[in-house]
Amino acid sequence: MAKSKKPVVVGIEILKKNGLDVDSLIKELVINASVEFTAYYYFTLLRANCTGMDGEGIKGVIEDARLEDLSHFESCIERIYQLGGSLPKDATQFIKMSGCEFLQLPPNPTDLTAILEKCLKAEQGAIVNWDKICNMTLGKDPATYDIAKDILAEEIEHESWFLELLYARPSGHMRRR
């Protein structure tokens, strides 16, 4: 079925013509996929350790961010493969490239402030990562730009949730979507 001849992919050729380094973009998308997947995993652990009366209210916020991180991971995968890339075959290597070791449970695994600080740090890192993709693709790759722009907006929203909880800083939302 599969032919050994490498196909011409017009969608990729146009991006190159637009001045985009497609290989660099794939590399950044794989890193972002790793970050989103690892954040999803660690947010699962952090959420589970939000205990007691105060923890119950925080679980929902972490759960919303966690599920959106899974969606971000899925968006990355689709675009990586469309661009001719792939994920690493070794899951350990994939997780290590995320740099998310800081998201492990705090020494006191039910310390809600420490959990929220970890969540905030994760969201702020994601903002930097997705801003980088937006800057790489602006005016060169509208498909990836739209994905990155939408994810960036969600990461900024998540940051505001955790800032609100940690610093009593109004976030502007009436309820999470």
Model-flagged regions — what are they?
Residues M1-R177:
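Iron-associated oxidoreductase/ferritin-like identity signal
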